[in-house]
Amino acid sequence: LIYSDQITTVSPTYAEEICTYEYGYGLEGLLSERAKEGRLNGILNGIDNHEWDPETDKAIAKNYSVKTIRDKSRNKIAIQQHFSLPEKEDALVLGLVSRLVSQKGIDLTIEAVTRRLDAGDNIQLVCLGSGEANYEQDLRVLRARYPDKVGVTIGYNEQLAHQIEAGSDVFLMPSRFEPCGLNQLYSLRYGTLPLVRNTGGLADSVVDSSDENLKNETATGFKFETATTNELDHALLRAINLFSRPRIWRKVVITAMEQNYSWEISSQAYE
């Protein structure tokens, strides 16, 4: 860091965050100096638009595009069938593909989703991941309490990850910190609205569904600020409410799918 001509991070917001005490881990002074000198820059990661393309993806039940967005619902049925959940088109399906660790906000997810389930909201949760034993067990317990609302696979399966991206309505990423993140970019591509904490690359790639952004038709997902159960729960409620307005929801989905976060775009910033 001292002798580098240039320093890059994987998102602009993370480049700012590492100049603070909270994220700098003792290097915030040096990094702040490099930022003032114009030698610290954040460049958002990109994704492979060929590997992650709902129009050609062989791992999903039914291919679709912006022009054939109705076919996305076939993938929702497929993921409900995979997890032995009732085939309910009007249920808001929340997807989670993640390491089950504190950094990813898994505890917040379990607590907030439990609140919504206890309240009787029409949601379903489908999870794929592995990690800390206590979180794995908490998810198993939640599945046992709500077998018609929660599906859990402990481990990782690439095909299932693609199907969750295609079949979910909302993708959960309530990370405590996230230098860039890729799943929110996959989710945008697949028209699955990311629900994220406003940090790192999540902040740079998701536009919140605020009233103003909905009016301007720039919204692509949902954001919340503080890593607390209450804030995540409030964001979930906003997603549930917007899902009950299908015409507006569809517009947000289309806007999300029209975003381009491919490496072809990101690589230009390195030139």
Where are these regions (language model features)?
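Catalytic cores of nucleotide-sugar-dependent glycosyltransferases that transfer UDP/GDP/TDP-activated
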Residues: 1-271
